[in-house]
């Protein structure tokens, strides 16, 4: 069973994605902010992470920088999912090492397709 970590501070988005990925036979983990995600990543090694950019405590960009430094996570794919939709925001996410950058509002179908493509 593939593992996915969803990192977002919006409860409705988290619930929707959690339901969708459980239905698609993923083991789902949830973090509400970047610091919680970093703490999770000390003990779980997901196949893929869906990561919001704008969150309290530690933002998505800083969280991704941490992920990229962790040798246990070298094969983990990261998709940014964010309301920050300027070209410069998208480019920053990709430059930091994200495998994809999707913008809100989003299509659940598109996210599932992107995840399946990456794993």
Regions found by a protein language model. Name each.
Residues 11-29, 118:
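Two-component/phosphorelay signaling modules centered on CheY-like receiver
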Residues 30-48:
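Acidic, metal-coordinating helix/loop segments flanking the phosphotransfer/catalytic sites
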Residues 55:
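Receiver (REC) domain active-site loop signature in two-component systems and cognate sites
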Residues 106-115:
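C-terminal output helix
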